[in-house]
Amino acid sequence: MKLTAIYKRVSEGYVGFVEELPGANTFGSTLEETRENLREAVELILETNRALAESEMDGADVIREPLVPFGGE
């Protein structure tokens, strides 16, 4: 699965977001700073979502396995 980053130049620098991941957005003074901030935002969102899911399933009989979405892309 590939994610799409969108960057928009604004008067103070750049804003960036990920089309496929609501809530993954950021700001930076430069494009490179914005790219790095966006990578960090995505990592934090995924880590947080995993931790929340694990805590909700704590003690439950669940099956956890890797998922390769959309034909292995």
Sequence positions of predicted segments:
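Short, charged, surface-exposed hinge/linker loops at domain edges
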Residues: 1-3, 32, 36-73
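A short, exposed loop/beta-hairpin motif centered on an aromatic-Gly-Thr core
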Residues: 22-31
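Short aromatic-glycine-(Arg/Gly/Cys) micro-motifs in beta-strand/loop hairpins
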Residues: 6-19
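Hydrophobic alpha-helix-in-membranes signature
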Residues: 19-21, 65
